[in-house]
Amino acid sequence: MRNRVLAFLAAAAGVLIPFVPLSAHHGSAAFESGKSVVMKGAVTRWFWANPHCFLSYDVKDESGNITHWVAETSNPPDMINRGWSKGTFKPGDEVTVTVEPVKNGRPAGRLLQVVLPNGKTLHSASPFQGPSN
């Protein structure tokens, strides 16, 4: 009986251990969950690739200083299901971006939604949020 229990535990550990790095990769500890920041900016780059897409954009403050922001979102197949595409943005597009900022204060965050120049709003479901409605 004891050998069966040990064999079961060893098999269970062998199956579960490879998933530990995945949960670390898809953790949300770096983000200020529940806090959102809305800003207007100009797109500098739309990086459309696995495992995550990234939107880079410049935000100008009241004094004219520019801060370069980067927002992470989900993978292309998830984004396609939400109406996004590789051609959603082009450099220079003026957009309104909503992110959950990172905790360390850097100009980065998890992309929640974007209002496009034509007024259309696109919602993002990052790997941490699950599907949007």
Residues of each region from the PLM?
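Bacterial N-terminal signal peptides
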Residues: 7-21
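Short boundary/loop segments of OB/S1/cold-shock single-stranded nucleic-acid-binding domains
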Residues: 23-37
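Structural detector for short beta-strands of small beta-barrel domains
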Residues: 35-51
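Short aromatic-glycine-enriched beta-strand elements
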Residues: 49-59
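Short, structured beta-strand/loop micro-motifs enriched in basic residues and often containing a Trp
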Residues: 73-81
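Short nucleic-acid-contacting surface segments enriched for D/E, G, S/T with interspersed K/R
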Residues: 81-96
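OB-fold/S1-family single-stranded nucleic acid-binding modules
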Residues: 102-125
